[in-house]
Amino acid sequence: MRNYFWFIAAILIIGMASCRRGDHFLKDKSYRERVEIRYGKQKQLGKNRFEEVFKIASNGLPLKEEEALKFILAYSSLSDIADYNGDFFLSNIRASFAARDTFSWGKTIPDELFRHFVLPVRVNNENLDSSRMVFFAELKDRIKKLSMQEAILEVNHWCHEKVTYRGTDDRTSSPLATVRTAYGRCGEESTFTVAALRSVCIPARQCYTPRWAHSDDNHAWVEVWAGGKWHYIGACEPEPVLDAAWFTAPAKRAMLVNTNVFGDYQGSEDILLKDERYIRINILSNYADTKRVYALVRDSSGKPVDSAAVEFQLYNYAEFYPLLRTYSNHKGLCSFQTGYGDLLIWASKNGNYAFSKICVRTSDTIKLDLSLRPGREYTLQEEFVPPAEKPAGYGTSDSLKETNKTRLAFEDRLRSAYEHTFIDSARAFRLAATLKLNPDTLWHFLYESRGNFRAITDFAGSTSGSGRAFLFPLLSAISLKDLRDVPFEVLMDNFNNAVFPGSSGGDRELFFKYILNPRVDNEWLRPYKSFLLKKFDNNFKARVRTDPGKLVEWVKNTVLIDEKANYSRAPLTPAGVYELKVADPHSRDIFFVAACRSMGVAARLEPGTRLPQYFFNNAWHDVMFGHTKLSSAERVKLTLDSDPDNDRKPEYYIHFTLEKFDNGFFRSLDYEADPRLGSFPCELDLAPGYYLMVTGNRLKDGTVLANLSFFNLVKGREMKQTIRLLKEPAQKVLGKLDMKNLYADIPIPGRISSADLILAWMEPDKEPTRHFIADLKAKKQDLEKKKARIIFLFRNEKDKNDFIAGTGREMPSSSLYLIPAKFNINMIPNTTGRPSGSILPVVTLINGRGEIIYLSQGYHIGTGDDLIRSLH
């Protein structure tokens, strides 16, 4: 009985202490208990970084701060536990609470939305930084007196002042690095914009279509919550109102729009995946007409199969991309809410598999009988049709458009003024003279570094003596994006801790690319060489240099592999892997390569298979963590050739891919940048196994003619495969123009008025037009060989002159730049009967008889290829 009273007294004391510490952040008791359980599991997983990450939560924080911190740590991705400390997350939590108290809309936001769409720092797979505090300080006074909807629009204008669109590589820069660069791809723009909105207590989430159905690309944008509902905006692309963007029409053709939600979210949206750390939701119905389709998985006798893995796949980039991976229930059923296009549905269990195309327009259920086994060789052709094109269906007044356009131009000037603070060539040449460096080479690196130029100048100035010979090789080894955000400390760490070869010290190129280079794949660059060199003793490092297999064994025995915890796909840094002793397979592979390089052993991820490799005894050696290692003699030579009837040279991830069968599904090999595939025939050395070659010919309306060839690679037998692109139907005339009306509106010179013309109505500052320009730049030589006559049409002299002075220099030599009398962008669509709208660019090919041969409106990837195929 006495023990019972002591227990009651203890509960009362804890309760009174809780009251003194303030109100709960997690107000629902059952939810709070679930967070505590998850926090305990995460703390156990991250036990090797308890002091750095978790200890602060037990330091007597105010109750709401403690619960908020436990919530964040409980559901964080593994990389965040490995590479960031608890005080980093606590400072962001305090900034979030301060923002909630600052703005009038803070008290109107439901707790659940604040918890999942304001509090988390991470948006996607970016490097995390202190942007929340920086952005809040800059935005607070600017938006404090606005309504929530007005504040959203104003924040997006601020984002446009800082950042505009330009394509970059797949690694996602941090928000502050994107601001420093002043441009980013859509994934970086949307990550930055979500970070800015959350910094001022506006619930925001990055949403994206992982692959378009009608075009070989994807797109990311932002949803914001205001007035009791979710709205969308184009990141760094301000419109006068919410729910208006250039991608409104393309999104109506999407097959999936989704977003990952941090934590145990209880919202009403359609759930694609429920993980213990996050939820993936399907929000396609916010943008397009949808339909739920079903897969019924059966065995060879027709009985339902439980727990079969099922993927709903979409053709894009010459592969079948899994929009959703799920599992059949006890009735053999699973489902997916999607758009009205075509998909490939693939099911597998216990080595058996089945697949079938589904036309969502006409079907709602596909039966998949698991009767196929790996090894059967055959070829089949399929046509995959995207959802039908539809108009955007929104409009804003001309006065609002003009006011917004004027403001956008002003914001462009603000951004340009910032860009003029970057180092110029005169300063670069003076620095080169002082340091006795090649001025043109130094200027190249400084020009590419943009707002990060000080890191490069400081690095150049800190090198001396014979080591300076390795300055440019190090800067050449990292990517262009690395130049824009690599810290000075990373450059110095690699420079000071690399084992430089002497005059006869082996292959210098190998050293530059695979020892000196800090970049392994898409990881966050932190100093790691000095860190790892201190952690491993000299005897071990010496043994690794004579036998890199010693490091392989150390990694196998020391690093625990967790396949699920790093759901953000942001790799752990090498230092983070060492400290945590837990990693996902990809981060483990990066760690192995980085550790090899730190010890003077050349290492890399093999470009096609992405397997870690080390260079030893003049050969590359695969590292098969947990897999059977193949010798070079066991590999099979595959020769690829292009069919002579192909009307273009096939390009990897555009016209074809190679896929290897693995655990019931085919997965693409990554040969995108491999120079061997630059000409045909070419040879690849591959592991024996079951393979699929996918080729695709995307037609002008987005339909794909796909060819699937299943084949085996057998040890000791060379194999040849021919890349065959299916022929498109005969070219159709889409409509016929009255050429007199065309000439009356557009001042086309008489000398070319009877020839084939490419007309392009332009909006140079918008992302769809920039994609079109990038297509033309990539196909410039081919267009010139075709003697293509391109006429770019602009609204005004400023747009025209700015374009000519910038990108115009990279356009085909026969291009003309004109201002039509009316800028009637609906002239061509109206003639063809296609849906018209206000989205640019409008690109058309007209022959000398006024017949419209080709038409593209708005966002479209591959216009350059389309035009080349259409020109005669």
Residue ranges and their predicted role:
Residues P747-L776, R789-L793:
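Short active-site neighborhood of thiol/selenol oxidoreductases, capturing the structured segment around
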Residues N316-Q337, D662-F680:
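Short, acidic Ser/Thr/Gly-rich low-complexity loop/linker segments typical of extracellular
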Residues A805-L840:
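Short, internal strand/loop/helix patches
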Residues K291-G302, G332, E634-R648:
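A short, amphipathic beta-strand motif
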Residues G227, H330-L344, K349-N352, I358-T365, ...:
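Short Pro-Gly-centered beta-turn/loop motif in secreted/extracellular proteins
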Residues D23-K27, G40, D141-L146, A151-H157, ...:
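Hydrophobic/aromatic-rich core segments of domains that either
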Residues S838-G858:
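A short, hydrophobic beta-strand/beta-hairpin element that forms part of a small beta-sheet core
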Residues K27-T181, D217, L400-L580, G626-H627:
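Secondary-structure boundary elements
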